[in-house]
Amino acid sequence: MRFGVLAAIEVSSALVGIVVGIVSALYDAGYWALVLMHLSTALARTVGVWLGCRWRPGLPVRGVGVRSMLAFGGNLAGFSVVNYFARNLDNILIGRVWGARSLGFYSKAYNLLMLPLRQISAPMSAVAIPALSRLQDDGERFRDYYLKSLSIIVFFTAPLSLFCVVLADELILTILGSQWLDASGIFRLLAIGALAQPIGNTAGWLYVATGRTREMLKYGSIGVGLIVTSFFVGLPYGGDGVALCYSCVVLLWTWPCMHFAARSTLVDWKGILGAIGHPLLGALTAGVAVLVLRFLLRNTLAEWAVLLIGAVVMGAVYLLVVFYIFGRKKSYVSVLRSLRKTGSTSA
């Protein structure tokens, strides 16, 4: 759990990739500049991890539990392959049936939405999984740490998702320009599913931390099957149809997914709903306030101004509801402190 080293490796490898890409482009490498950028980033990351890790491979030794580790890793790799297939099939289908233009709108909307959500979920996952693994023999501490982490995830992602739903047009126009306006509908529909997606993603924490990757592959494959089905159901209606059906499946499957992941732990529905309830209600309240504001200002101010004012109102109303009406200010501050303390002590 040397997160400072990991952060330094990620930042430095990204910088190496950027420099290589720029230099390659200056020397007229064309599209190969992009290839070289990604390759150099991966190579720099590998070198950084190798230098930062004290362990070195040696000769194989019998009787050290390799078989169980291979089973754990094999199931985890299997889930990653299946999940990767599902995450990319929508692009393949839309491009094949509706062409490059529709694929461009869909892909741009999806990537724009996922960018901020990943910046929240990825660091939390990097901290939560090893911490939970250390706590798996202490059921109550495991449960408390997971629920606190889940609450923090939803605290940040719920208002962000609702903000994207309400001000999708303004976001697309301000960030991408009017030529991408057709992507706003897809962006809005995907953002609806993004309300539940970060919650469902934490199910993976429970599976991995408790060594139940076989169940992760089993139930994850069911979820992938539902997602793939949603793509085919929505495909006749273009990118909007795929986005709508995908979000519906995410909203519906998240709850069985959480049930299967939590049933071998002390995490229960009362705890889950308690962790996510106030942030979701606060985000919905703030979303309604921004929706009213958008209706009043849409035809009087530029899109960027509506976006800026909407962000201020969203944040103010959300914090007012969660911190003061629900009285959660002290609890969230203490949660952040305890997560940081648990993460450091479990190292």
Describe each PLM feature range.
Residues 259-269, 290-347:
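Membrane-proximal transmembrane or re-entrant/amphipathic helices at the cytosolic face
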Residues 19, 23, 27, 146-198, ...:
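Alpha-helical transmembrane segments of multi-pass membrane transport and lipid-handling proteins
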Residues 25, 84-115, 130-134, 164-179, ...:
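Helix-terminus/linker motif at the lipid-water interface of multi-pass membrane proteins
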Residues 9-21, 34-51, 79, 83, ...:
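Short runs within selected transmembrane alpha-helices of multi-pass transporters and secretion channels
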Residues 31, 67-79, 94-114, 143-145, ...:
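Interfacial/gating helices of multi-pass transporter permease domains
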Residues 4, 31, 47-92, 102, ...:
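Interhelical loop/hinge segments that connect adjacent transmembrane helices in multipass membrane
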Residues 109, 113-157, 204-209:
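Helix-loop junctions and terminal segments of transmembrane helices
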Residues 75, 90-92, 102-121, 148-155, ...:
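Alpha-helical transmembrane segments of polytopic membrane transporters and translocases
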